[in-house]
Design a protein with these regions (language model features):
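Extracellular glycan-recognition regions
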Residues: 1-193
Length: 193
């Protein structure tokens, strides 16, 4: 059974509150997580609800936002330290909603995107799973989970993970996290029949 400790904010946002079981967050101006690659800058001022989690686990998030400005983003993050982390979720680029994954190792970020269908403000469900040194990112497509990324990240036994959101160019992105569910890790099988 996994142990998820009481969370703390890393860069508390302008506003956040509960609406029933949902958590609503409003981002601050020019907030992001990115380390060096291509752009040559380092930003560590995005909003992250950091839960300490030990060992292997899965976390599932269902969320929506009023994405409108380039790079508006919301989703999940797993963090070892400022130089080693992963963030994944929806990012607004090229005028549309994309599924984005950034893996940062040794102070260098990479970035991958996948186009998503549907309205920009439609809810998205993702699952982030830790299997020892591997991180598995999946998105729910109807009733089916689709693998988006399988990545290596050197991690100690205990890491921080949880919801994340940023507005690298704009501000006041309103994100609604409808579901945040922690569980033991899903099966390691990548290609079930």
């Amino acid at each position: 059974m996994i142990k998820v400790r009481t969370p703390r904010w890393i860069n508390e946002p302008v506003a956040h509150h509960r609406e029933g079981k949902a958590l609503v967050v409003v981002t601050g101006s020019e907030t992001d997580f990115w380390n060096n690659t291509f752009y040559g800058f380092r930003h560590q001022n995005g909003h992250f609800i950091a839960h300490e989690v030990s060992g292997d686990f899965s976390v599932e998030l269902k969320f929506s936002a009023n994405y409108a400005t380039l790079y508006d983003q919301a989703g999940a993050m797993l963090r070892v330290d400022d130089n080693n982390w992963l963030k994944c979720g929806v990012e607004f680029t090229d005028g549309r909603k994309q599924f984005s994954v950034v893996v940062t190792r040794d102070d260098q970020s990479d970035w991958s995107v996948m186009r998503l269908r549907g309205k920009a403000d439609a809810p998205t469900t993702l699952r982030l799973t830790r299997h020892a040194e591997a991180l598995r990112v999946e998105i729910k497509d109807g009733k089916t989970w689709r693998l988006v990324r399988l990545a290596f990240l050197g991690m100690p036994e205990t890491v921080e993970a949880g919801p994340m959101c940023c507005s690298p160019i704009g501000e006041a992105l309103q994100v609604r996290f409808e579901r945040i569910a922690w569980s033991d890790p899903i099966d390691r099988e990548l290609h079930p029949n």
